[in-house]
């Protein structure tokens, strides 16, 4: 979504307030996401440092244990959830609270499926491959990078619940609720993009 200042309309009864972007909330969110980007950059740096220290052969051998088709499917679900999230934002900008709820619920379910897939993958790696957080440098790098991302996705799921809860608790859909939906979408798109980078780095580059 573009962060260039544009005006959108949210219909709330007879009033027609506009959501002007960027506003202080949106700008603050973008600044915060910039700091999060630095955090993930540090995780990427750690990953490549451990890989260079242990050697490519060791890393490639460990990476062979990953179930790439399963992870690719899980990744596709997360990426598609970015589309459903954006459809929810478009509904919020139109003041269509029913469509906002529908698309945000779909997004929440897809995000929850992604997290469930990660938990399943962790279980399989620990049980059948012996790869754990403390097993070796590869395990440490794998679980730290994907685990911290999973925590961020979980945070996004909580944010969706809060936005949805406000739409049910309030008597009418307001400017503030539309802004909240937009801000949550910024965060969700961010974690999706970060995961694409992680997936390419961890699962595809050997």
Swiss-Prot record:
PROSITE patterns: COX3. Pfam families: COX3 (PF00510). This is Probable cytochrome c oxidase subunit 3. GO terms for cellular component: plasma membrane. It comes from Streptomyces coelicolor (strain ATCC BAA-471 / A3(2) / M145). Belongs to the cytochrome c oxidase subunit 3 family. The keyword Glycosyltransferase does not apply. Keywords: Cell membrane, Membrane, Translocase, Transmembrane, Transmembrane helix. The keyword Transmembrane helix applies. SUPFAM superfamilies: Cytochrome c oxidase subunit III-like.
């Amino acid at each position: 979504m573009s962060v260039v200042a544009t005006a959108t309309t949210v219909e709330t009864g007879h009033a027609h307030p506009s959501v002007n972007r960027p506003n202080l909330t949106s700008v603050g969110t973008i600044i915060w996401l910039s700091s999060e980007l630095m955090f993930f950059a540090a995780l990427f740096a750690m990953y490549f440092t451990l890989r260079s220290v242990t050697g490519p052969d060791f890393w490639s051998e460990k990476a062979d244990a990953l179930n790439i088709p399963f992870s690719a499917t899980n990744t596709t679900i997360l990426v598609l959830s970015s589309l459903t999230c954006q459809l929810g934002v478009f509904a919020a900008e139109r003041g269509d609270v029913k469509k906002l709820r529908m698309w945000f619920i779909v997004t929440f379910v897809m995000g929850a499926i992604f997290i469930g897939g990660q938990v399943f993958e962790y279980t399989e790696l620990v049980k059948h491959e012996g790869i754990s957080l403390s097993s070796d440098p590869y395990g440490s790098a794998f679980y730290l990078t994907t685990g911290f991302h999973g925590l961020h996705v979980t945070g996004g799921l909580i944010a969706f619940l809060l936005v949805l809860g406000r739409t049910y608790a309030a008597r009418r859909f307001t400017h503030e609720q539309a802004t909240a939906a937009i801000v949550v979408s910024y965060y969700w798109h961010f974690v999706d993009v970060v995961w694409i980078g992680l997936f390419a780095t961890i699962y595809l580059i050997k």
